[in-house]
Amino acid sequence: MLDNALLGLTHEQQQEAVEKIQQLMAEGMSSGEAIAFVAQELRQKQQKLNNTHS
């Protein structure tokens, strides 16, 4: 599930991801769904960054 786009997160980015996952779970989403959702968001952000630097 992890890929290069997710492995290079700063500590701050990791903390934000954890908080987002916890928020989604508090709203009723399962842990697996929340993790997948946040991972997809991170991949999309990374892809946008890569596209703007190309």
Curated annotation (Swiss-Prot):
Region forming the signal peptide: none
InterPro entries: UPF0181
Pfam families referenced in this protein's UniProt entry, alphabetically: UPF0181
Top-level lineage group: Bacteria
NCBIfam families in the cross-refs: PRK05114.1 (NF003476)
Protein family according to the UniProt entry: Belongs to the UPF0181 family.
Record-given protein name: UPF0181 protein PM0480
